[in-house]
Amino acid sequence: MTHKPTPEQDAILTAVASSSANLMLVARAGCGKTSTLKLIDSTLRSAALLVCFNKSIAEDARKEVRGTTTVKTFNSLGHSIWAEYHGRKLTLNKNKLRDIYKAFADEAPRSERTFLWSLYDSVTSAINMARAIGYIPASHALARKAIATWSDVERRLDETPLPEVQGIADKLLNLSIAQAYSGVIDFNDQVYMPALFAGHYPSFPMVMIDEYQDLSPVNHAMVSKLCRNSRQIGVGDPAQAIYEFRGADSNAMSRATEQFAMDTYPLSLSFRCPSAITSNVHWLVPDIRSVRDGGSIHHGGSLDLRPDTAVICRYNAPLVRLALETLVSGTRVDVAGVDIGSRIIRLLEKLGPTSLTRSQALDAIANWEAERESLDSKTAPDLADCMRVFVSKTQTLDGAISYAQHLFSSTEGEIRFLSGHRSKGLEFDHVYHLDHESIKTSGQDPNIHYVIDTRPKETLTYIKSHH
């Protein structure tokens, strides 16, 4: 930290030193939550645990904190707890769920296998959501430890599952739990198993939790066990809660504040965003301010190839379309921040024979979209539009697949293209917000709008698709 602590940071440091209360820091975009955590850590005299959202953040934090502060992610913490409970080294199999499903399908009568594989995405999505929010099948001996019901799982899925899905998901989740007890786990098990089933939690005088708004119910269950006798400091921004679709609790911060009787402190002075940028998001976050005047908001215009520039969009299809147009025009692009590249390629490959003509492929996309929408899919229109982008550029499905593979392998370009979800935690000098008017005003979409609009350090430009 190169600047003098702000009055807000001073107030937090005073609270840390002068009381034993649990604290929740509401840190707006670019408002120094990381530097504040480092400041807090530097004042501590006893051992502490810092829990970070992902591995890269944890690795960076580990270089900055005291030697007596342990830095973990929820996954690495859970892995060590489950390994200690298990008593020997665990086997981490990232394809565990697919292996279980394949064995299950292979044991079924041959006449049923095609149908079972058609349910693969629905079943595995349900199992992963179940493990994120804490569902245990009623048929399991430890079902009483569940913190979610099947209805909770269904409510959070992208589409309404067919009636057969619950029975298959329950059977395979029971098999997955049994494998975890035998020592074979995947990444979801690292949190699910120690959160709900068993394990001895380490004890620290102080536990600091970063990105609190992104905690899932099973993360919250881990925190409850971890902080039985510990002081807790949480940091997050409820306006940046955008991961409900993968199991995060949209009320994680308010729920924790009540459960742990936490005193709330603000961090509302942005070091990243100049005044024009912070004023622009007062419609959602009226308390955010900037340490510096300046910045600018623009509407319309073409992409300017300045250094440190990003194009960000709530939806993938407009992003893919513009990235492809930019690539064709001769400008190198970086689409590593597009969420669904591998999924789009997989969906294209499933449309039918690669010899399908453009017209036939477009018909297949329409049929796929109609089928998904009949199940109330929230993402089918965006996925279908992504596929249409590639099919419309070529004569055959084979050409569309090749086009998609070429685009999604572009990761070292002059302009970065990112979805709103993938842009979280990043910052750029110049940001183009593509098709902002298409963002809904319900659910977590306003939060995504805010996240995108607070990535720039200098300029924010709103642009529209040509289509």
Task: Give each language-model segment a name.
Residues 1-89, 282:
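P-loop NTPase Walker
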Residues 2-14, 22-24, 36, 111-208, ...:
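Accessory N-terminal region flanking or inserted into the helicase ATPase core
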Residues 26-37, 43, 53-56, 213-300, ...:
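Conserved helicase motor core of SF1/SF2 NTP-dependent helicases
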Residues 49, 68, 205-206, 232, ...:
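The start of beta-strands in P-loop NTPase/AAA+ ATPase cores
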Residues 55-130, 327-344:
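Conserved P-loop NTPase-based nucleic-acid remodeling module centered on helicase motor cores
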Residues 87-106, 258, 284-291, 349-373:
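A polyampholytic, Gly/Pro-enriched intrinsically disordered region
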Residues 174-176, 180-181, 186-197, 208, ...:
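Flexible, surface-exposed loop/gating regions in the mature catalytic domains
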Residues 349-467:
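Conserved helicase C-terminal RecA-like lobe
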